Curated annotation (Swiss-Prot):
Occurrences of domain DAD (ranges): 1040-1079
Keywords associated with the record: Cytoplasm, Lipoprotein, Myristate, Phosphoprotein
High-level lineage: Eukaryota, Metazoa, Chordata, Craniata, Vertebrata
Record-given protein name: Formin-like protein 2
Alphabetized Gene3D superfamilies for the sequence: Formin, FH2 domain, Leucine-rich Repeat Variant
Family: Belongs to the formin homology family.
SMART domains the UniProt entry points to: Drf_FH3 (SM01139), Drf_GBD (SM01140), FH2 (SM00498)
SUPFAM superfamilies to which the protein is assigned, alphabetical: ARM repeat (SSF48371), Formin homology 2 domain (FH2 domain) (SSF101447)
Length: 1086
């Protein structure tokens, strides 16, 4: 080591003497040009080149000077000539000793040049003319001749050396099968392989062994390994080293070096090669060669021996443990992993690791634990396979239990919703009571304050009166005044003048009474009110819509006026609205009926629609069947004031040739022509003698309804009178309500009855309507019956709707996870808009629908997809926020306005029922209905109030207006948002699976493209695919390790990363995908 130290000092002095003076900095333009040339020559990755471009001009100039100094140091052939000189066997030992003094220094300069010079210098060193790699490997072999041959006798060494080319030849064949190097390089390798094999088949001479022992005492082996590492750091150099027949073998044989630092360097380099595609097989082949050369009984025997014996060097032990972990567990074939694992188990690795489990070195402990985590437990795998079926059956049972529990959970949620509603009602009631108590307290506090103020004023008045009385007594004693009492209790204070006589002016002080004048004025009676004015004329005065009253004399004020005489009977009603608005004197004659229309000889039936008299048109009978004209007809009550009220279509028909019209438009399928004259003569003979007062269609529909009931008119009317819903179902009552007699129908029926015409002549429908219309308060009773019959169904229908509104409102307002989601959306929205529109403090809920409209640059995902990813990765605890939103979908389908109107209708129906019961308190059916259902209606009203308040609160809570945002608008926003969010989650998962499948496919294609020439046209697409693979890996692997593609600097990166992050295999310790999720790791490949 002292020699090494002297070499280092010589190296420092040598560099100090050769450092040129600092040249002046050129112009900025020239500086940038020279810096660009140097940067291109350095062949750096883009990120490092970008970092160097950020240097200031001073640092750039220093870098230019350093690079130019290194570049002009020595050309490659200089180092090659010096190394060949050390290998010359004809050199005398004295001359060799003098030359070898500077060998380490030459190798160090070579390593620096290989590591720092541009790629052109390295390619020149490795080209066909210089063959720098062959020379370097040959020198490495020479440097460790002595170490290798000192392990065995000369005889065994000869046998090993003769067979040494066999594993090399096998390795060469394997390498050439998968080599993708260009043909010139392949020819170079084959030639160098023949040259090296020729040398290895000859026994080293005695002088060579002595020279090798002299070199082995120095650091030449260590620096040679560093030179090879620098070469392998370039992709071009790495491929050449991997294709060289002896390079990796010589690196592995360097483990025989006595320097632990060198052995650690070798193991780190071999471990990095294992992680490159195809490198693992080369490393195993090198250790097979190591076994034959060193006479091992088992592979890796010397490695384990060094691992046990070098326990005082932690760095070497860490490197050994790291290499063992990688060489065993970096292969994909699980059976091969178990085989390699068992190799080290037979060498005693497991027992030795058990001894090292209490080591004080954290680095070593980390590597040991990484190996133990990657170990395959075959027994555990067998147990997993045996228990898998039982576990699957258990899973099925658990899924069935989950299904049952989900049903129970749904029932529990329904019960919870009812309890929540009850609690909300109680809370609202308590809040109301609290408000009342506060008002009472406020009023009481005001009254107490007022009373205290009055007491204080009274006390002050008493005190003032006492003071005045004292002053009066004092003045009386002094003789200034004289107090004179009067008979009515008043006190007169008379001042005394100097002459001793009383003053004429006296002051009267009122005690408990007022003065005489004021008392008289206040105690006198009020004047009587003026009598009412007499009527202006003696003629009787008529009152609109009221009876005629004669004038009465004005009564005196004290007695009440006598009642007016009874009015005369009212006149008969007039048809039309004039009877309601125009007053008429008694005994006024009725108006004459309207004359018949032109062209008609018989009078027409006229009915009053409330607006104007409308003539009922008779149906027209045609000879042939005519097609139907599908128009939209106006109802009779809709033509008043229209143009149709002023035209007469029947007069037009008289002017037209209807026979021709029928002939033209008659339908194709016709029967014999109808003789209208004969039919008119037969109608009176076939028709019944019954008289019909109702409109034909109405009477027909009424007859159908009555036939469905199967009850007589008496039974129906009696059931209506006593509200018997058992006799009359509610459906029949609702149908019958459509046939409540109109005012005109009642008038026609009453007129028929007053004329005392026989009822037998009426049809069944008219007789029913006659009896039906005589029921007192028919409209009210029918409404009450319909209300009572539908009450239970209405309560059952409205209650769940109100509960859904309450539960949805409370769950949305109280959801902390939803609040977090909105917070994320607000943050991202402000981030996107702040530079253009400025930051906002909130947003309308309708903005949630716009999350799907905001798409990424590549148009492959929306803002909602991104939010879903962010929530899953950063805020996983709120990813199931929609589970906190209960009954939102049910609430979205509720029209709260209509529900509240229905509740009010129920209240009106209950009020109508109560009024009817007060008039007929003997009706037990009404009494029982009111007693049993009044509380239910009150509860429903409370629920409606709570639902309205809860909905208003949640709408205001989210910044919306309850008046313009009904539940049908508010809740669907959350329904759509939750649906879109779930869909975004599913699409994100699908996209990840597709990306994973694509990555696997590209990995398969990558193996095939390794055979392609880098200069071919497909090389560019290959690089793009490799970049895509790297990106996909970065998405999958969540740790800080990098992905290595075919680029310069990869070996250094792998070694650096392995020092910080231990290697983790693809499958964990148990190795069962059923019980443990596979742990993804990286593949390092070129």
């Amino acid at each position: 080591m002292g020699n090494a130290g002297s070499m280092d000092s010589q190296q420092t002095d040598f560099r100090a003497h050769n450092v040129p003076l600092k040249l002046p900095m050129p112009e900025p333009g020239e500086l940038e040009e020279r810096f660009a040339i140097v940067l291109n020559a350095m062949n750096l990755p883009p990120d490092k080149a970008r970092l160097l471009r950020q240097y200031d001009n001073e640092k750039k100039w220093e870098l230019i000077c350093d690079q130019e100094r290194f570049q002009v140091k020595n050309p490659p052939h200089t180092y090659i000539q010096k190394l060949k000189g050390y290998l010359d066997p004809a050199v005398t030992r004295k001359k060799f000793r003098r030359r070898v003094q500077e060998s380490t220094q030459v190798l160090r300069e070579l390593e620096i040049s290989l590591r720092t010079n541009h790629i052109g210098w390295v390619r020149e060193f490795l080209n066909e003319e210089n063959k720098g790699l062959d020379v370097l490997v040959e020198y490495l072999s020479f440097a460790q001749y002595a170490v290798t041959f000192d392990f065995e006798s000369v005889e065994s060494t000869v046998e090993s050396s003769v067979d040494k080319s066999k594993p090399w030849s096998r390795s060469i064949e394997d390498l050439h099968r998968g080599s993708n190097l260009p043909s010139p390089v392949g020819n170079s390798v084959s030639r160098s392989g023949r040259h090296s094999a020729l040398r290895y088949n000859t026994l080293p001479s005695r002088r060579t062994l002595k020279n090798s022992r002299l070199v082995s005492k120095k650091d030449d082996v260590h620096v040679c390994i560093m030179c090879l590492r620098a070469i392998m750091n370039y992709q071009y150099g790495f491929n050449m080293v991997m294709s060289h027949p002896h390079a990796v073998n010589e690196i592995a044989l360097s483990l025989n070096n006595k320097n632990p630092r060198t052995k650690a360097l070798v193991l780190e380099l071999l471990a990095a090669v294992c992680l490159v595609r195809g490198g693992h097989e080369i490393i195993l082949s090198a250790f097979d060669n190591f076994k034959e050369v060193c006479g091992e009984k088992q592979r890796f025997e010397k490695l384990m021996e060094h691992f046990r014996n070098e326990d005082n060097n932690i760095d070497f032990m860490v490197a050994s443990m790291q290499f063992i972990n990688i060489v065993v567990h970096s292969v994909e074939d699980m059976n091969f992993r178990v085989h390699l694992q068992y190799e080290f188990t037979k060498l005693g690795l497991d027992e030795y690791l058990d001894k090292l489990k209490h080591t004080e070195s954290d680095k070593l402990q980390v590597q040991i634990q990484a190996y133990l985590d990657n170990v395959f437990d075959v027994g555990a795998l067998l147990e997993d396979a045996e228990t898998k079926n039982a576990a699957l059956e258990r899973v099925e049972e658990l899924e069935e239990n989950i299904s049952h529990l989900s049903e129970k959970l749904q029932d529990t949620e329904n019960e919870a919703m009812s309890k929540i509603v009850e609690l909300e009602k109680q809370l609202m009631q308590r809040n109301k009571e609290l408000d009342v108590v506060r008002e009472i307290y406020k009023d009481a506090n005001t009254q107490v304050h007022t009373l205290r103020k009055m007491v204080k004023e009274k006390e002050e008045a008493i005190q003032r009166q006492s003071t005045l009385e004292k002053k009066i007594h004092e003045l009386e004693k002094q003789g200034t005044i004289k107090i004179q009492k009067k008979g009515d209790g008043d006190i007169a204070i008379l001042p005394v003048v100097a002459s001793g006589t009383l003053s004429m002016g006296s002051e009267v002080v009122a005690g408990n009474s007022v003065g005489p004048t004021m008392g008289a004025a206040s105690s006198g009676p009020l004047p009587p009110p003026p009598p009412p004015l007499p009527p202006s004329s003696d003629t009787p005065e008529t009152v609109q819509n009221g009876p005629v009253t004669p004038p009465m004399p004005p009564p005196p004020p004290p007695p009440p006026p006598p009642p007016p005489p009874p009015p005369p009977p009212p006149p008969p009603p007039l048809p039309g609205p004039a009877a309601e608005t125009v007053p008429a004197p008694p005994l006024a004659p009725p108006l004459p009926s309207a004359p018949p229309l032109p062209g008609t000889s018989s009078p027409t039936v006229v009915f009053n629609s409330g607006l104007a008299a409308v003539k009922i048109k008779k149906p027209i009978k045609t000879k042939f069947r005519m097609p139907v004209f599908n128009w939209v007809a106006l109802k009779p009550n809709q033509i008043n004031g229209t143009v149709f009220n002023e035209i007469d279509d029947e007069r037009i028909l008289e002017d037209l040739n209807v026979d021709e019209f029928e002939e033209i438009f008659k339908t194709k399928a016709q029967g014999p022509a109808i003789d209208l004259s004969s039919s008119k003569q037969k109608i009176p003979q076939k028709g019944s003698n019954k008289v019909t007062l109702l409109e034909a269609n109405r009477a027909k529909n009424l007859a159908i309804t009555l036939r469905k009931a199967g009850k007589t008119a008496d039974e129906i009317c009696k059931a209506i009178h006593v509200f018997d819903l058992k006799t009359l179902p509610v459906d029949f009552v609702e149908c019958l309500m459509r046939f409540l007699p109109t005012e005109n129908e009642v008038k026609v029926l009453r007129l028929y009855e007053r004329e005392r015409k026989p009822l037998e002549n009426l049809s069944d429908e008219d007789r029913f309507m006659m009896q039906f219309s005589k029921i007192e308060r028919l409209m009210q009773k029918m409404t009450i019956m319909a209300f009572i019959g539908n009450f239970a169904e209405s309560i059952q229908m409205l209650t769940p709707q109100l509960h859904a509104i309450i539960a949805a409102s409370v769950s949305i307002k109280s959801s902390q996870k939803l609040k977090k989601i909105l917070e994320i959306i607000l943050a991202l929205g402000n981030y996107m808009n702040s530079s253009k529109r400025g930051a906002v403090y909130g947003f309308k809920l309708q903005s949630l629908d716009l999350l799907l409209d905001t798409k990424s640059t590549d148009r492959k995902q929306t803002l909602l997809h991104y939010i879903s990813n962010v929530v899953k990765e950063k805020y996983h605890q709120v990813s199931l926020f929609y589970n906190e939103l209960h009954y939102v979908e049910k609430a979205a389908a509720v029209s709260l306005e209509n529900v509240l109107l229905d509740v009010k209708e129920l209240q009106r129906g209950m009020d109508l029922t109560k009024r009817e019961y007060t008039m007929h308190d003997h009706n037990t059916l009404l009494k029982e209905f009111i007693l049993n259902n009044e509380g239910k209606l009150k509860k429903l009203q409370d629920d409606a109030k709570i639902a309205q308040d809860a909905f208003d609160d949640v709408v205001k809570y989210f910044g919306e207006n309850p008046k313009t945002t009904p539940p049908s608008v508010f809740f669907p926003v959350f329904v759509r948002f939750v649906k879109a969010y779930k869909q975004a989650e599913e699409e994100n998962e699908l996209r990840k699976k597709q990306e994973q499948a694509l990555m696997e496919k590209l990995l398969e294609q990558e193996a095939l493209m390794e055979q392609q020439d880098p200069k071919s046209p497909s090389h560019k697409s290959k690089r793009q695919q490799q970049e895509l693979i790297a990106e996909l890996r970065r998405r999958q692997v969540k740790d800080n390790r990098h992905v290595y593609e075919g680029k310069d600097g990869a070996i250094e990166d792998i070694i650096t990363v392995l020092k910080t992050v231990p290697f983790t295999a693809r499958t964990a310790k148990r190795g069962s995908r059923f019980f443990c999720e596979p742990v993804l790791t990286e593949e390092y490949h070129y």
